[in-house]
Amino acid sequence: MSSKKRKSPPQESLTSYFEKSSKSSKKYGSQNKDSDSSSTCLQQKIEIQWSITDSLYIAKYGKLKKTKKFIAFDLDGTLIKTKSGRVFSKDAADWTWWHPSVVPKLKALYQDNYSLVIFSNQNGIPRKPSAGHTFQMKIRAIFESLDLPIVLYAAILKDKFRKPLTGMWNSFLKDVNRSIDLSFIKYVGDAAGRPGDHNSTDLKFAENIGIKFETPEQFFLGHSFVPPNFESFHPKNYLVRNSSSHPYHFKKSEHQEIVVLVGFPSSGKSTLAESQIVTQGYERVNQDILKTKSKCIKAAIEALKKEKSVVIDNTNPTIESRKMWIDIAQEFEIPIRCIHLQSSEELARHNNVFRYIHHNQKQLPEIAFNSFKSRFQMPTVEEGFTNVEEVPFKCLKDYEDTWNYWYE
């Protein structure tokens, strides 16, 4: 995704906007009792410095201390919440501090020589033309209410900047422009994989960076937190568990045959087909390329008539979707085998984002995974296959150093 900087609005327009915002900041921020003038650390008016690209908003308020100690936060559900009780704020004024202890805690951190940073996913901004301006107004009110040097990074697209990916963190490191000791850094966020949490993005973000993590309840209120164990899928643990397993090697049949691949989108079917099966003379039939089922059938039959073996590189989730290939094999009186790629849904979704970020491949929509999951029927020899091979996913060695991060 392009991150080319858009032309910034004229300074006069920004100044006019900030003046208007400052007049209304009392309406937005001063009703929060934590922001009384006696605790203000910045006595003069500070203009927010905005840097806006196609997928990243950066807002700087004041100048961060030259310190090795940083505390980073999520925004929504961690530092602030909506006044209305809605999940998403209805306007720039629909916010209040998450808890009365937030501002005193942040001011104490500042006095203790900590620099404050916010990393936030804001993917709602591109959906509405006015959302970007509304977000800037809200940030203006929040920063003026807090009145401490602070910097915000907000990812607005599903690209390298979106948590749990570390693009925002890398941008921050570039801006800080000095070495940072990760042992002095902590990230606080509400998306921690607990029952009731919308996801575990914040916890995974901290794990990707390699820094300590706390929930807002833990950090501000002193509550305990037991991290989830991610038993179903954890990229680093998956690599460790499968480090000693041997990679799958496709064995070419001595006779003409049909091979039917079965598995989630992004489970490795096409990689297997292209790297191991097509290279041994098999004709690949793929509906993403041919577009329709009828064209797939036609291509397979034409290859079989030329006495070539065929590999069906589709998801093939149901007995019915596989039956037509079994019928064709019986018509040609040749064997048909099935290779089931045993990637879990979590692993497949992980691969989907991984190949989008690192290999510039199109990211598949949510419905592709939900559809396969809801329709999937385990392949068996009773359907008519001569055998069914179960093949676990094996990450290519060259990709392990980047694949082992959280992407979802």
From Swiss-Prot:
Residues 1-38 are annotated as: Disordered. Disulfide bonds: none annotated. ATP binds at G263, F264, P265, S266, S267, G268, K269, S270. It is found in: Nucleus. It comes from the Eukaryota. Keywords: ATP-binding, DNA damage, DNA repair, Hydrolase, Kinase, Multifunctional enzyme, Nucleotide-binding, Nucleus, Phosphoprotein, Transferase. One of its GO terms (biological process) is base-excision repair. Pfam families: AAA_33 (PF13671), PNK3P (PF08645). One of its GO terms (cellular component) is nucleus. One of its GO terms (molecular function) is polynucleotide 3'-phosphatase activity. The modification Phosphoserine is found at S8. It catalyses: a 3'end (2'-deoxyribonucleotide 3'-phosphate)-DNA + H2O = a 3'-end 2'-deoxyribonucleotide-DNA + phosphate; a 5'-end dephospho-2'-deoxyribonucleoside-DNA + ATP = a 5'-end 5'-phospho-2'-deoxyribonucleoside-DNA + ADP + H(+). Residues 10-19, 28-38 have a biased composition (Polar residues). Coiled coil: none annotated. The keyword Nucleus applies. Its EC number is 3.1.3.32, 2.7.1.78. Catalyzes the phosphorylation of DNA at 5'-hydroxyl termini and can dephosphorylate its 3'-phosphate termini. Has a role in the repair of breaks in single-stranded DNA. In the N-terminal section; belongs to the DNA 3' phosphatase family. This is Bifunctional polynucleotide phosphatase/kinase. It comes from Schizosaccharomyces pombe (strain 972 / ATCC 24843) (Fission yeast). The gene is pnk1.
